[in-house]
């Protein structure tokens, strides 16, 4: 039986069949793109994936998937419910083996899908407050009433997100500080969790990898369910999640 705040070492398509209908608020996942020869990088069949996603999501649930081309284009075209992209801009490029043939890749897309309008909590940034007074006469519309716009300085988010990649941090004790080659930064996952869910909601990550989505959920008081087929990554993710849970109990 699938329980909250747990991850499972099993095929996600089989595991999702055990999740009740309409019980998930958001899917936030970095699925395999199928662009490398790594054994963990086998792309999932879109038809079976969407069948399970739409079944387990609440009517206003949202699917948020990381991607790169050509995977991202195939993913968008696999369902009529693609809505928009975020762009995650990293601080360090990738693809150095092809640097003489094409530009380095410094971004990933984050695709958003939904059937009904989902939860959306804009993550404001703070700018300078301002007050604007428009003239009573404009070139395009002629004479009109004077308009005053007052802002407290809050800025709505734009669709480009700047977060340092998890693998861009200096290694500790001479070894790398990540446990998965495509590990995402916790702060980026926290941003997405805060944007698309509320406290107490349940997030599914069906390709849990290093456990970052679970860590973000724990930090932001959301529930999580995860699946990870690779036993090595599963064990490391479990250890990481337990350490975070133990840390949170201290406060």
Task: List the predicted regions and their residue ranges.
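Core catalytic lobe of class I
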Residues: 1-226, 232-235
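Short, conserved SAM-binding/catalytic segment
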Residues: 1-2, 238-251
